């Protein structure tokens, strides 16, 4: 079936053509096309080709611009570091700028971006703030065009030694883990990005079997399961992953049902992350350098299905685990070892609910307290706390292999890496 033609005007386009007239695919060449000269047709084809090239180039340029990042580095201050640093990173060109001080602040050991990407928040891992035995949380506005940070305000963290924080998807609530104080606190975020004092502080209870590291609770991370109000807190001191529900109207935390899950005694859960779709939870245990895998139902960890070592079988030295990240492909899980000074590479067999340790890459320095993947999963930044350097690796999505790119930079005591796409 072909489009019905009517009497034409101008250049021969059918007059008053309707969508109904052309609802089927065209099977013949319209007469107005046939009347074009060969030369004119070639000219049009040439113009179309040129336009196609220009559109492709524009699309490539936009994609390239979208893959330029400001990389923020949280640090421990007091020796060579003065606060939060920033480097410019061009992923397509694999070019890294010189680190510059983005904000001067004490012990910003972990950072988090607001969902709007206009604000950045940092813990102040302190034992005292404004004359009180408590740590701090700082709010910054990200300066457009430069990525520099402008301090908005600071608030107490609700306990000593805050070590991790996150912002919920609504952008209204910030949750912080206070390692030293054994508490988890919720702070409200104002529309202008400033922080209000804590609206909720929950104290953990209990201990476990390690004689020095598990005498009391030590919340080490806070994570909100994607797409839910479930808050997960790995507590190194109690061998539990404590589960809460965040009330997005009040900011209050209430116990989930079940209120926690446990890892093997003496493990010391430090950080955790989900597989794609929240089907599995990977818990990195600091004290034993193992990963515990939980099967989840609606993001809630329900069944411990595996605990696997992140170290080579023949390694006999001292070691603690630090960070864990899932590759965007969902095929690879990476964790860091402090002592062995490596990044462990696991293949994830989802159908079997199993992690397989397939190898290690050197971290490029000593004590890789933190590392992170860029959003595409093509590069990994390894932050080595005790050698004051960040080393960049390329990631092979097919094999999980990490290859040193030869790119690195120096920052005093780097302990957190986050990426912000340059607007």
Please give the residue ranges for each predicted region.
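Bacterial N-terminal signal peptides
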Residues: 42-59
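An edge-strand/N-cap motif at the start of beta-rich repeat modules
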Residues: 65-89
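Short glycine/acidic-enriched loop and turn motifs that connect beta-strands
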Residues: 77-80, 126-130, 180-182, 238-239, ...
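Beta-rich, blade/repeat-based domains predominating
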Residues: 80, 105-115, 128, 158-169, ...
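Short loop/turn segments immediately following beta-strands, especially the blade-tip
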Residues: 88-94, 140-147, 187-196, 245-252, ...
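A short beta-strand motif characteristic of beta-propeller blades
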Residues: 97-103, 151-155, 208-212, 257-262, ...
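Blade-loop segments of beta-propeller domains
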Residues: 98-167
């Amino acid at each position: 079936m072909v489009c019905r033609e009517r009497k034409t005007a101008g250049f021969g386009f059918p007059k008053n053509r309707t969508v109904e007239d052309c609802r089927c695919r065209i099977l013949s060449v319209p007469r107005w096309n046939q009347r074009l000269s060969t030369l004119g047709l070639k000219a049009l084809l040439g113009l179309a080709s040129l336009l196609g090239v220009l559109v492709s180039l524009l699309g490539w340029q936009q994609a390239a611009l979208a893959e330029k990042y400001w990389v923020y580095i949280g640090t421990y201050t007091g020796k060579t570091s003065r606060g939060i640093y920033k480097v410019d990173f061009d992923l397509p060109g694999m070019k890294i700028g010189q680190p510059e001080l983005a904000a001067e602040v004490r012990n910003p050991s972990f950072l988090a971006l607001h969902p709007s990407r206009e604000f950045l928040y940092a813990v102040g891992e302190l034992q005292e703030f404004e004359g009180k035995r408590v740590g701090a949380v700082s709010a910054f506005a990200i300066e457009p065009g430069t990525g520099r940070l402008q301090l908005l305000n600071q608030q107490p963290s609700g306990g000593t030694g805050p070590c991790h924080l996150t912002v919920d998807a609504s952008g209204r609530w910030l949750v912080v883990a206070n390692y030293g104080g054994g508490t988890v606190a919720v702070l409200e975020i104002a529309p202008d990005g400033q922080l209000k004092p804590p609206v909720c502080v929950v104290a953990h209870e209990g201990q476990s079997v390690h004689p020095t590291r598990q005498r009391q609770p030590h919340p080490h991370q806070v994570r909100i399961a994607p797409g839910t109000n479930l808050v997960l807190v790995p507590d190194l001191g109690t061998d539990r992953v404590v589960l809460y529900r965040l009330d997005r109207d009040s900011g209050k935390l209430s116990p989930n049902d079940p209120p926690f899950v446990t890892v093997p005694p003496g493990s010391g859960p430090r950080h955790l992350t989900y597989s794609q779709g929240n089907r599995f939870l990977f818990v990195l245990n600091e004290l034993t350098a193992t990963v515990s895998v939980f099967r989840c139902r609606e993001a809630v960890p329900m069944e411990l299905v595996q605990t696997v070592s992140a170290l080579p079988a023949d390694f006999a030295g001292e070691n603690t685990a630090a960070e864990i990240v899932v590759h965007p492909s969902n095929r690879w899980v990476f964790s860091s070892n402090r002592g062995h000074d490596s990044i462990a590479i696991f293949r994830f067999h989802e159908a079997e609910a199993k992690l397989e340790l397939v190898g290690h890459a050197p971290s490029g320095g000593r004590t890789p307290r933190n590392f992170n993947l860029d959003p595409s999963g093509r590069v990994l930044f390894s932050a080595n706390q005790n050698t004051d350097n960040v080393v960049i690796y390329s990631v092979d999505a097919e094999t999980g292999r990490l290859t040193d790119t030869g790119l690195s930079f120096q920052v005093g005591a780097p302990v957190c890496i986050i990426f912000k796409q340059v607007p």
